[in-house]
Amino acid sequence: IIKSNLNLSKKTKLVVVPTTAGSGAEVTSNAVIYINKIKYSVESEKLIPDNFFLIAEYVKGLKKSIKSSSGFDAISQSIESLMSLKSTKESIVFAKKSLNFSLTNYLNFYKNPTNLNTSAMCIAANLSGKAINISKTIAPHAVSYPFSVYYNLSHGHAVSLNLEKFLLFNFLNQDKSLASF
């Protein structure tokens, strides 16, 4: 990971409008760059936009493949945030709220998008971004990158290939004293 010791300077305000309902990048300090199929992560508080606007109309008409991939990314980020050793009370609140929005609206957003369920998925993605900005993602995201790079699989779909296996592994190997939520 390339950390913020790059001495980056902000010369202007950054205002963003997400065009998917998935990554929550509008509230995170992380970026990913691929060079020759090698993933480089950049992390700096200076990467967090100064402002953002969640506009359902820009997301509502996306192809179903993009909706399913980005929606699953938000769901996975929330689940991973809950499982992360770096989770905090604040990240857990964000992750649980995100999952509530996601699990209530994902199927309708995918099948019959309305401004209401699309807005809910945009909020879910934003909350998942807030959660992982604190806790970071864990193994399911890390393992997904080769699937995207070498098999041209979308990010959310790549994560979906292995999340279940990690959940099962962690469930079977959990410390029973930690199973409070």
Predicted segment positions?
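Gly/Pro-rich interdomain helix-loop hinge
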Residues: 149-181
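Glycine-rich phosphate/pyrophosphate-binding beta-alpha loops
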Residues: 22, 127-154
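Proline/glycine-rich low-complexity loops and linkers
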Residues: 2-34
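A general structural signal for well-ordered alpha-helical segments in protein cores
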Residues: 72, 99, 140, 159-160, ...
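Buried hydrophobic packing segments
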Residues: 1, 78-79, 102-105, 125-128, ...
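Carboxylate- and glycine-rich phosphate/diphosphate-binding segment that chelates Mg2+/Mn2+
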Residues: 30-135
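Structural motif
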Residues: 12-18, 31, 50-52, 73, ...
